[in-house]
Amino acid sequence: MAASDQHRSRRHDESSSRPNKKKKVSRNPETNLLFNLNSCSKSKDLSAALALYDAAITSSEVRLSQQHFQTLLYLCSASITDISLQYLAIDRGFEIFDRMVSSGISPNEASVTSVARLAAAKGNGDYAFKVVKEFVSVGGVSIPRLRTYAPALLCFCEKLEAEKGYEVEEHMEAAGIALEEAEISALLKVSAATGRENKVYRYLHKLREYVGCVSEETLKIIEEWFCGEKAGEVGDNGIGSDVGMLREAVLNNGGGWHGHGWVGEGKWTVKKGNVSSTGRCLSCSEQLACVDTNEVETQKFVDSLVALAMDRKTKMNSCETNVVFSEFQDWLEKHGDYEAIVDGANIGLYQQNFVDGSFSLSQLESVMKELYRESGNNKWPLILLHKRRVKTLLENPTHRNLVEEWISNGVLYATPPGSNDDWYWLYAAAKLKCLLVTNDEMRDHIFELLGSTFFQKWKERHQVRYTFVKGNLKLEMPSPFSVVIQESEKGSWHFPVSCENNEESSRTWMCISRQSILDSPKSNGKIP
């Protein structure tokens, strides 16, 4: 054999005798069990998982952990919809949970949710709520979620145990957990079924606050209540006679609801129909409102903007930046008679990303003229534009006269160097409660302020988008009405129904009304 062949042969023998470093290390019994349980969970094989569990608890080699119990409990709770497995899943699930607790292992949120679902499937809402309360009282890193409470709440509502359902809701509220449509509908249904008219009123407003458009299932619950005998017996106890108070409440709430209680007398008229493009109900001819944020929300929004703007400027280590924003606040206080705020940079730079493209003052001028034309009070809007941009425009002889005219007329404010003009135009629009013309989606601001729900509502009411097609301007004004549940000062209700395509012209609305003082030819003198 040649020397080279001998060397290769020896090297091969040595390598084959050495362990392969890339070879998978054998798993310990606990890891093996968890792997197999996860496989059973994916395939929804409850029987196989229980067999693995039974073998593990009789073995001295396996020590069950929280993950093992969690996987088993999840699989049990996921099997309760299968009639053939329901009893097995419930019985073994409770057995597994008892062993978990007796072993000194604290259940996490996922495990508690699974046990609550098992208890609810058994019809034991008390136990479902008990395990959640015990979990919350212990505290820790894992916190309850809507899904943790839902089994107990829905179980109580289904069994018409209204007071217990309300107790669960109170516990959720204390934990900072908001209801969603399924839970609100369940509470609405049990309240209607047990004749609690004040609770029905409360949960209708919960739907308005958290849901917007309702599902067909929820609509049926609402319809059954208003068509029922109890709803017709509920009067307004004189509330409806104080029309001034109701109108003021609607105004303070931002439009679309007053929240003072049932208004009107007698049976309700329930109709399903459509709403015109201008917001006129085609069933009762009532004009739907364009719902804005209320006074408290708006002021909180303005205060948040000021705080965030100041904080950003402080982080820039400039001793002047807080002063200049305060100067703008003072200036706006003196000159703040505007119906619209214009994001100058957004409009001037629109579609200018081409060779030789620059700031288009003509586009900005078109927007200004159109807003002035559409203003019923012949008012010019206010442009917010960075001082550097204003300086450049003033240096251009073609633009100088127009820009100087805007400045002298108080319709152009130059934001100072080192400042983000976004904060200026957003603050101005919020403070003055007026329109904001920009195509900016403002995604950077949403999560820093009051949350996406509030900010989305504010944008829907105040943001004006625009397009230029072949140089022709088109402004996209906010909708003349809001597609949300509405309660009028007359006591009528309008419920928009969820639809797949969200096409407003074909959306079904349920219109609910009855006789009120505003329908009477004479009043008691309280109507202003």
Curated annotation (Swiss-Prot):
Single GO term (MF): metal ion binding
Cofactor(s), names only, from the UniProt record: Mg(2+)
Compositional bias segments (type: Basic and acidic residues): 1-16
Residues at which Mg(2+) 1 binds: D343, D421
Region (Disordered), start-end ranges: 1-28
Entry binding sites for Mg(2+) 2: D422, D440
Localization per Swiss-Prot or TrEMBL: Nucleus
Reaction(s) this enzyme catalyzes, per UniProt: Endonucleolytic cleavage of RNA, removing 5'-extranucleotides from tRNA precursor
Ranges for the PPR repeats: 29-64, 72-107, 108-142, 145-179
Outcome (variant: D421A): Abolishes ribonuclease activity
Summary of the knockout phenotype: No visible phenotype; due to the redundancy with PRORP3. Prorp2 and prorp3 double mutant is lethal.
Annotated ranges, domain PRORP: 275-511
Enzyme class: hydrolase
Similarity comment: Belongs to the PPR family. P subfamily.
Entry function: Endonuclease RNase P responsible for the 5' maturation of tRNA precursors. Preferentially binds precursor tRNAs containing short 5' leaders and 3' trailers. Also involved in the maturation of mRNA and small nucleolar RNA (snoRNA).
Protein's name in the database: Proteinaceous RNase P 2
Upper taxonomic lineage: Eukaryota, Viridiplantae, Streptophyta, Embryophyta, Tracheophyta
